[in-house]
Amino acid sequence: ATEDLTVVTTMMESRHLAGDTGLIEALAVIINPSAMWPPNDFIRGKLSEQQNRHDRYSNTEYALEPNIKSSPGGLRDLQVIEWITLRCFGNGLSDVNEPDFLSETERDQLRNGQEFLSQVRFALHNMTGRADDRLLFDHQKKLAALWGMVDGDTLAVEQFMQVYYRWMKT
């Protein structure tokens, strides 16, 4: 498990829900940065995973019908930032007070972007009746209507996707 970055990341996100608190405390000792995956190695590993994912989802097909979770700027990128802050500072993004890492404005932008993308993802899952993260053309039109956008000088679907891409660039 200590060799696998995905397993380490999953263990980092563990939290006490019920039962013996000593177990979660013991896990925290085992997975602390000095015990395995020091922060610099962890960051390099996560950025390598991110680059591989970006390479996979950066083609034209995904530019026009992006994957909310995996396309560049999507929810997985926000999760990478969350994991890095957790690994380096011991706190999640919302609890980190490190101005040299992120300003309050940047943290707010990330939080707002995550909220928007999560809402779009939830709406898409609800609309399709399954865990589908791809914004296909038909879905884009329905989501634009759901967000209250109407055709004008710019089509509603274009308005929606402009908002979507602005958040993806955040």
Predicted stretch roles:
Residues 1-170:
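A nucleotide- and high-energy phosphate-metabolite-utilizing enzyme signature
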